[in-house]
Amino acid sequence: MAVPLMQQIRVGAYLIKQRLMGVERYPLVLMLEPLFRCNLACPGCGKIDYSDVILNKRLSVHDCLEAVDHCGAPVVSIPGGEPLIHKEIVEIVEGIVARKKFVYLCTNALLLEKNLHKFKPSVYLTLSV
């Protein structure tokens, strides 16, 4: 998958800024997991071994955006579980996009047709299957 030129430039500028400021260690990608639950039970995935107490937990929109702001990384990857199960995933993605962060929404695509229309097209949003 090719990385769009705008993303290359923005991430490159972020890297240069960190170097110029003398920052030695800085985040590049935030792995944001708003939930562990999935609509599949793949044997190779360790998430299915978690108890229902863990699988039923959800991060709120506020908690997700607070993590994005605190981390400061230019790229946010949202893996799963299956993020499209989260009832507020659209609001989470919109909040991240509004912050001009590049979002990679990783999905198994089983719920994509049902939910795709809810997401506004953006140069900051990439769906990864």
Positions of PLM-derived features:
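Non-cysteine beta-strand/loop elements that form the S-adenosyl-L-methionine
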Residues: 122-129
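Conserved alpha-helical substructure of the radical SAM core
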Residues: 2-115, 124
